[in-house]
């Protein structure tokens, strides 16, 4: 087991899918995702500064995140694997893949980039374009929880809000300076009812920086976390094709 994954990296399965949580969340955000994905296995990444790593300092850059994760999972990349993430997690996927290639390690067979536009075009989502001193982060957390059908106890709301604020500040500093090569294909995913990063903002420009395919799935911005059948089918189909190639 590594501190960078909530559970041990599975030793079985024909392929692995590593899930990187989006801003303000940790590995527990993947609680609706099964450990088995067809013939493959899913493994949720756990960044520092939250959940079971709450006492640790947050990373200061996307590169630091990539270096920390890769250092711990490098010896487990013994079969085809993918990275998947939603919204603000997407820049981390790109940084991780670029770092893996730079180190000469096995690269992901595919990235699944959900709810985020082309990285070189800038940032996406309202929290990247407002005065953070005037944003009620507690209300943001409550809105997310309500959309997913649960409530956080009051004592956890402030804690979650602080994590979200730290993550958004880091997100705002992202620049697409390290991107993986076109040898790492990207499945870009938009959602029909996404009001945070509308699908019309998701696709334009990806073909300029990646070998990308575009998929539109039914649901709102939070549907990714519910792991609908459409998304599961896409992941299993693409990874089955990857291991057969």
PLM regions: where:
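Domain-scale detector for complete catalytic domains at protein termini or as standalone homologs
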Residues: 1-84, 91, 95-245
